[in-house]
Amino acid sequence: MPTVLQLAISRGGVPKLPILEADVTPLGIAGDVQKNRKYHGGPNQALLLITSEGLDELKAAGYPVYPGALGENVTTVGLDRRQVRLGQRYRLGAEVEIEITKMREPCRTLAPYGPTIQKAVYDPDVKAGRPESPRWGLAGFYVKVLQPGRLYPGDPIVLLADPC
């Protein structure tokens, strides 16, 4: 079963640092700050979710990434990024419900991890919403919080609805 590996926040920018529990609100994790509100945050981008398996792929390709490095609030383990689709709804832990709303389009914030990382995690197929891209989900998924609540590392992740 997929689970929450790490929860993370920052005062803006990357990396986000691990926390032991999260108060998840409709606008994200309490205490998390986004510097550029024009492109980050808001109800449809309340959280950024990235799979640990995707991070492992990037590490194997030589990028010095780790949970929280790419700015994600929620790092998962056991969730197949290739099966995640826009519109899917998940329960995280006992209380939190989310909906996948948007693919994350990487920006210059990721430059510390290598000059080619943006191309390694995102391509025209991802931008067009085609999950067959080998880069699908590597940059992460933005989510909307449908049901706020408490969340902890180790909490299960359950698919509730799949509109596909």
Which residues make up each language-model segment?
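Metal-cofactor-dependent catalytic cores
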Residues: 1-164
